[in-house]
Swiss-Prot record:
Function: Catalyzes the complicated ring closure reaction between the two acyclic compounds 1-deoxy-D-xylulose-5-phosphate (DXP) and 3-amino-2-oxopropyl phosphate (1-amino-acetone-3-phosphate or AAP) to form pyridoxine 5'-phosphate (PNP) and inorganic phosphate.
SUPFAM superfamilies with a match to the protein in the record: Pyridoxine 5'-phosphate synthase
The protein, known as: Pyridoxine 5'-phosphate synthase
Pathway annotation: Cofactor biosynthesis; pyridoxine 5'-phosphate biosynthesis; pyridoxine 5'-phosphate from D-erythrose 4-phosphate: step 5/5
UniProt record similarity statement: Belongs to the PNP synthase family.
Protein's gene: pdxJ
CDD domains: PNPsynthase
Active site: H42, E69, H190
Subcellular locations according to the entry: Cytoplasm
Binding site for 1-deoxy-D-xylulose 5-phosphate: D8, H9, R44, H49, T99
PANTHER family from the UniProt entry: PYRIDOXINE 5'-PHOSPHATE SYNTHASE
Top EC class, one word: transferase
Length: 238
């Protein structure tokens, strides 16, 4: 299983003092050198952490894969086509939220989704949708022309009772299997950490996990290299 590192909260820390450090681009380079298969950043409409210049510099420096998380807006579509990350991930976005709170509402947005996706894919950029692990959402993602679905693991990360955890893993596994059978690649993310990641090793359809807050929190104390290698050990060797 591969690991994509979300470096948004490096920018959050930098912006807390309106300084130049820590630098998300430097953090991304260390993550790549430590074994990360990709770098994820979310250019939010309010620019609360990653800024436009960060995205430009990341595009110039990332050597693995750059995944731009973004809202489904004309502005973000233009930015994506101009900067050409390897991949965009469409996510829901609310200004008042601390972090993304749920999967992309593909049912409500379906009528304009295929039209939005086509010029992005025509520019040579793959498209992923951050969705709830439900068969209907998977089917609509495939029909709209997505390449990848990212299973929203937030609800799983909040479960405490073993039976609830098992039920959520089963739900994710079923959706992931359906997605792969539908011709989609499957990744997973949101709320995953060093303590709840192990069950995902048993879901063979999931090729990559995307981890941000937990990994950056460990990096703040132990360093980015250690944080990345510790996670890679858990998902591949434990």
């Amino acid at each position: 299983m591969q690991l994509a590192v979300n470096i948004d909260h490096i920018a959050t820390l930098r912006n807390a003092r309106n300084e130049q450090q820590p630098d998300p681009v430097t953090a991304a380079a260390i993550a790549e050198l430590s074994g990360a298969s990709g770098i994820v950043c979310h250019l939010r409409e309010d620019r609360r952490h990653i800024k436009d210049r960060d995205l430009e510099r990341l595009r110039e420096s990332v050597t693995t894969k750059l995944d731009l998380e973004m809202a489904m807006t004309e502005e973000m579509q233009r930015i994506a086509i101009r900067t050409k990350p390897e991949l965009i991930t469409l996510v829901p976005e609310k200004r008042e939220e601390l972090t993304t709170e749920g999967g992309f509402d593909i049912i409500s947005h379906y009528d304009r989704l295929a039209e939005f996706i086509k010029p992005v894919r025509d520019a040579g950029i793959e498209v992923s949708l951050f969705i709830e692990p439900e068969e209907k959402a998977v089917a609509l993602a495939a029909k709209a022309g997505a390449d990848i679905v990212e299973m929203h693991t937030g609800p799983y990360s909040l479960k405490k009772r073993p039976e609830d955890i098992d039920a959520e893993i089963k739900r994710i596994r079923i959706a992931a299997s359906y997605a792969r059978d539908s011709g989609l690649r499957v990744v997973a993310g949101h709320g995953l950490n060093y303590y709840n990641i192990l069950p995902f090793r048993r879901i063979e359809e999931i090729e990559e996990v995307s981890i941000g807050h937990a990994l950056i929190a460990r990096a703040a104390l132990a360093g980015m290299e250690t944080a990345v290698r510790d996670m890679l050990h858990l998902i591949n060797e434990a």
